[in-house]
């Protein structure tokens, strides 16, 4: 079976998940950077979630991010807390 360039690119793309706040400047900035670089990602705006779900998420987040800083960028199961552009780009292989 022959694959197209797009199929190959999609296979190489890392799994990216963001935990963000809808009002967070740096959260928006990381989304724009990922969009500009052409990466697919999923995100959750915690402040827009129902209270019970948000509290459950925050209890998990506190385990590795006690200050509850945002954004949280998870690339292939590696969590980067805060907007650390250079580190994010290193993990994405674009630096």
Where do the protein language model's features map onto the residues?
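Conserved N-terminal glycine/acidic-rich loop preference
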Residues: 34-35, 40, 80-91
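A short, hydrophobic beta-strand/beta-hairpin element that forms part of a small beta-sheet core
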Residues: 70-80
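A general structural motif
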Residues: 13, 68-70
């Amino acid at each position: 079976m022959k694959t197209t360039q797009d199929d190959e690119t999609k296979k190489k793309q890392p799994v990216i998940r963001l935990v963000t706040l809808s009002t967070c400047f740096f959260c928006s900035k990381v989304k724009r950077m990922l969009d500009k670089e052409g990466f697919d990602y999923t995100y959750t705006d915690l402040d827009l979630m129902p209270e019970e779900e948000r509290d459950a998420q925050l209890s998990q987040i506190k385990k590795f991010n006690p200050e509850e800083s945002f954004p949280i960028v998870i690339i292939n199961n590696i969590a980067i807390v805060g907007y650390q552009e250079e580190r994010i780009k290193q993990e994405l292989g674009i630096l």
